[in-house]
């Protein structure tokens, strides 16, 4: 498979993972929502405790501190776009948001998330690759950027 095509397909997969709650944020860092990966990285152990008849999962950190699973911040599609370079909005004659084109990488290759065309687009030295963004994911991206536009 072409390296550029694989790259844009991986971007679509990463965005879908963010949108589905497959990542969480702890200590300002991003982790897959997989307790084994988190504990391997942080050196913690997983325990469960019965609290007033409910079973709660928590992580015991190396310093002895406890983090309850419910206290972890689930990453959203907005977190995926927390560090973009530029954005072009498509605005209707009624001045309402319609779509956007977000520059997420540049300088080799340039990569855009385009919700009008529903594609991740990569361009680099005459090479071009694109991957389709599923409708439900595109709607989540548009929902986030419509909120940003209206702020």
Regions found by a protein language model. Give the residues of each.
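Acidic interaction surfaces
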Residues: 1-151
């Amino acid at each position: 498979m072409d390296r550029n095509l694989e790259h844009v397909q991986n971007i679509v997969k990463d965005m879908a993972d963010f949108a589905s709650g497959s990542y969480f944020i702890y200590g300002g860092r991003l982790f897959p929502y997989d307790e084994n990966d988190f504990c391997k990285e942080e050196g913690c152990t997983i325990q469960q405790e019965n609290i007033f008849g409910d079973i709660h999962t928590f992580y015991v950190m190396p310093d002895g501190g406890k983090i309850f699973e419910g206290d972890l911040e689930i990453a959203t599609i907005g977190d995926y776009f927390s560090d973009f370079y530029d954005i072009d909005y498509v605005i209707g004659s009624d001045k309402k948001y319609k779509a956007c084109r977000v520059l997420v990488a540049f300088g080799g290759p340039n990569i855009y998330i385009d919700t009008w065309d529903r594609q991740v687009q990569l361009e680099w030295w005459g090479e071009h690759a694109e991957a389709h963004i599923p409708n439900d994911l595109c709607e989540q991206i548009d929902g986030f950027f419509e909120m940003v536009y209206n702020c």
